[in-house]
Amino acid sequence: GGSGGSGSSGNFTTASNIHMSSVTNTSIAGTGGTGGTGTGTGTGTGTGTGTGTGTDTGTGTGTRNGTNSGTNSGTRTGTASSYRGGGGGAGGGGGVTIQHLTLTESLLNK
């Protein structure tokens, strides 16, 4: 704000009498000015980086046990005859093999 005026004092004399008189001026304070207004803008940038590492380890073991069992059995029979001698029986299959051979008496007597 503006400053007030300064006061002054003084003495003066008159022609007929010597008279001291004090005059005081009272200063009046000035009023303050208004504050200014302001605006502001700001920008900001930022970057961030990060790295991460990880390790996964694991072991696994397993055992599988199994038994497969089976029985195959069968009977193959066959007959064979021949004028020149008995033929072989039919071949046996897996498992038990039974061979039959049938010959006639006429062949046995020759």
UniProtKB/Swiss-Prot annotation:
Q: Where does this one sit in the cell?
A: Nucleus; Cytoplasm, Perinuclear region
Does the record's keyword annotation contain Repeat? Answer: yes
Q: Where is this region: 24 X 2 AA approximate tandem repeats of G-T?
A: 30-79
Q: Where is the composition biased (Low complexity)?
A: 64-83
Q: How is it modified after translation?
A: Phosphorylated with a circadian rhythmicity, probably by the double-time protein (dbt). Phosphorylation could be implicated in the stability of per monomer and in the formation of heterodimer per-tim.
Q: Where do the sequence repeats lie?
A: 30-31, 33-34, 36-37, 38-39, 40-41, 42-43, 44-45, 46-47, 48-49, 50-51, 52-53, 54-55, 56-57, 58-59, 60-61, 62-63, 64-65, 66-67, 68-69, 70-71, 72-73, 74-75, 76-77, 78-79
- Quaternary assembly: Forms a heterodimer with timeless (TIM); the complex then translocates into the nucleus.
Q: Any idea what job this protein has?
A: Essential for biological clock functions. Determines the period length of circadian and ultradian rhythms; an increase in PER dosage leads to shortened circadian rhythms and a decrease leads to lengthened circadian rhythms. Essential for the circadian rhythmicity of locomotor activity, eclosion behavior, and for the rhythmic component of the male courtship song that originates in the thoracic nervous system. The biological cycle depends on the rhythmic formation and nuclear localization of the TIM-PER complex. Light induces the degradation of TIM, which promotes elimination of PER.
The molecule here is called Period circadian protein
Organism of provenance: Drosophila erecta (Fruit fly)
Question: Source taxonomy lineage?
Answer: Eukaryota, Metazoa, Ecdysozoa, Arthropoda, Hexapoda
